Curated annotation (Swiss-Prot):
CDD domains linked to this entry: S1_EF-P_repeat_1, S1_EF-P_repeat_2
One cellular component term from this protein's GO annotations in UniProt: cytoplasm
One example of a Gene Ontology biological process annotation: peptide biosynthetic process
Name of the protein in its database record: Elongation factor P 1
Compartments where found: Cytoplasm
Family label: Belongs to the elongation factor P family.
Length: 185
């Protein structure tokens, strides 16, 4: 429990209505000298934003997330199946939680997941992954227009720009935050 006056942007709180991320906090003076805390909250499982007012001395339950290491196994229907490496339980994570991270997934990739009350709320990929090139442009096709790079399709289906010496079958290191080529492995 924390005082509402200690809330800050980015914190998660748990209320009777659900789990929320604090998106803004402001202190407001009341009519009789009492102050209250005006907070904008975004539901953790949707984009719905609500505003709540708390007395400055009111206690609020801070949500304590657990970070778990998961290994990707495979796609089943609309969910991604992961193995929790801590307790060896299988977890299904829906597409909405994965967002665009699924573009980098292949069997065996280890990710970090934020879990609250045994529900996964976010998944973070490693910053760098090694993926195999499954298709590339011919060097002459795009080099003259793009300054010495060509398109490459990776084994997961994502397309990146690579130097002309990268060929089909090469394994390359990719920055998952920017989707950029780093080096040939």
């Amino acid at each position: 429990m924390v005082l509402s006056s200690q809330l800050s942007v980015g914190m998660f709180i748990s209320t009777k209505d659900g789990l929320y991320k604090v998106t803004s906090v402001s202190k407001v003076a009341g009519p009789k000298g009492e102050s209250f805390i005006k907070v904008a909250l975004q539901a953790a499982d949707s984009d719905v934003v609500i505003e709540r007012n708390f007395k400055a001395t009111q206690e609020v339950k801070e949500a304590q997330f657990e970070t778990r290491t998961l290994e990707y196994l495979y796609l089943e229907d609309e969910s991604y199946l992961f193995l929790d490496l801590g307790n060896y339980e299988k977890l299904f994570i829906p597409q909405e939680i994965m967002k665009d991270n699924f573009l980098f997934l292949k069997a065996g990739v280890t990710v970090s997941a934020m879990v609250y009350d045994n529900v996964v709320f976010s998944v973070e990929l490693p910053h760098f992954l090694e993926l195999m090139v499954s298709k590339t442009d011919f060097p002459g096709d795009s080099l003259s227009l793009s300054g010495g790079v060509k398109k490459a399709l990776l084994e997961t289906g994502i397309e990146v720009m690579v130097p002309p010496f990268v060929e089909i079958g090469d394994v390359i290191k990719i920055d998952t935050r920017t989707c950029e080529y780093i080096q040939r492995v």
